[in-house]
Amino acid sequence: MRPSDLTRFKQKGQPIAVLTAWDSLSAALAEAAGADVLLIGDSLAMVALGHATTLPVSLDQMLHHTQAVARGLTTMPADQPLLVCDLPFLSYQCGEDRAVAAAGRLLKESSAAAVKLEGAEPEVVAVIDRLVRMGIPVMGHLGLTPQAVHRLGYRRQATDAISQERLLEQACTLEQKGCFSLVLEHVPAELACRVQQALTIPVIGIGAGDDCDGQVRVTADLLGLTAKQPPFSPALVDGRRLFIDALKGWVNQTRNHTPPTNGRITQADRT
């Protein structure tokens, strides 16, 4: 999968499925499920590393997890999902040279094919322009931007007419600067529809209604593994309860010296 494939998907009206991955196991599961894009999101700071926000994760950690995701893929390279890696907080807000070095390192030292940046401030737009001119594919991200949590919080964004027009202008600017796709997070569905119609690049939504060109979800949220679910990303299964019950069953079997309840005794059970 290449960035240009997503544009063809939009032209054909084929919805784009994006899942997050943070290690080889989550990557293998998402690939087997048929995801078009695997996003190594800085949400791994919360999902995998136990932080309260995405801010603490470092570039080295993002690289480490991206390499692990790449190792989890099993299909031929041409058939693999597109790997997109978030540039973490302060890896691109402190100057174009630093941003190019960070993005270049992710692409050189892992199998990532693109990076994602949040926001459309003039400094970020300049970075996007520079990265694209250097041959680095960029995915944009507007609406709720978790790296700005201390300024904007986790509330719904662009809820009034002025902010909606501003976001639409920002989206058009990101396309003009060369972004190959755009994530819209936690914004009104009507606004997302307007953005989708205004852009030729794919618009990937999360909490932005059903009229986007695709959807992105944090895999752990979909599987119900997180203790607190985002209101715009309901779980499909109660994975947390399933896992706890399974592990609790094994603990009880071990303590009671009882065989597995399904009757199967594996070599691991015998050792």
Curated annotation (Swiss-Prot):
Its EC number is 2.1.2.11. Keywords: Cytoplasm, Magnesium, Metal-binding, Pantothenate biosynthesis, Transferase. Binds 1 Mg(2+) ion per subunit. The gene is panB. Homodecamer; pentamer of dimers. The keyword Magnesium applies. This is 3-methyl-2-oxobutanoate hydroxymethyltransferase. CDD domains: KPHMT-like. Transmembrane segments: none annotated.
